[in-house]
């Protein structure tokens, strides 16, 4: 199964040069270097808590700012997930998780439906976490959903520390993605849709 549920994406523009490898049936092993330390930290959360093996290498124009690299990593990772899922046969399809981190609690609910949509409700008071612009969190997820074809709802239940809120978000996201992409043995080789198909981005 693992050999069928992995993919590699290479994406090069005038602004960034990115390669992503993902194994959906992995052990949470990651090698990540984007040039954006806080983004690296969040991507490690996706790998570790989702149990996805993940290799990401990005070179971008971070001397200008982090926006292009942050967005393009989201694009490439979304494409990698979509390619690894293929026709999405046998997957559970839906996932949800509540993740706490100290005072913060974030809920993520998602559907690997082939219908890209983001509802985003994080209230981040700090303009930056370290050197990372907190506006880029939403930009990352916009890029991801548009290229993975998932419906994603992110809801902050409570929290005051921006770092805690964002990290709880990524942890909840990783566990929800793990739940949604895992194989449902009762579905065997069928597509989890009454229509008989799910769009593949």
UniProtKB/Swiss-Prot annotation:
Catalyzes what? D-erythro-1-(imidazol-4-yl)glycerol 3-phosphate = 3-(imidazol-4-yl)-2-oxopropyl phosphate + H2O
Please provide the record's keywords in A-Z order. Answer: Amino-acid biosynthesis, Cytoplasm, Histidine biosynthesis, Lyase
Biological process annotations from GO: L-histidine biosynthetic process
Enzyme Commission designation: 4.2.1.19
Q: Which CDD domains does UniProt cross-reference here? A: IGPD
Q: What is this protein called?
A: Imidazoleglycerol-phosphate dehydratase
Q: Which GO terms describe its cellular component?
A: cytoplasm
**Gene name in the database record:** hisB
Tell me which InterPro entries the record gives: IGPD_sf, ImidazoleglycerolP_deHydtase, ImidazoleglycerP_deHydtase_CS, Ribosomal_Su5_D2-typ_SF
Domain of life of the native organism: Bacteria
Q: GO MF terms on file?
A: imidazoleglycerol-phosphate dehydratase activity
Q: In which pathway does it act?
A: Amino-acid biosynthesis; L-histidine biosynthesis; L-histidine from 5-phospho-alpha-D-ribose 1-diphosphate: step 6/9
> What NCBIfam families does the entry give?
PRK00951.1-3, PRK00951.1-5, PRK00951.2-1, PRK00951.2-4
Instruction: Name where it's found.
Output: Cytoplasm
Please name the PROSITE patterns in this protein's record. Answer: IGP_DEHYDRATASE_1, IGP_DEHYDRATASE_2
Question: According to its UniProt record, which protein family does this protein belong to?
Answer: Belongs to the imidazoleglycerol-phosphate dehydratase family.
Read off the Gene3D superfamilies from this record.
Imidazole glycerol phosphate dehydratase, domain 1 (3.30.230.40)
Disulphide-bridged cysteine pairs: none
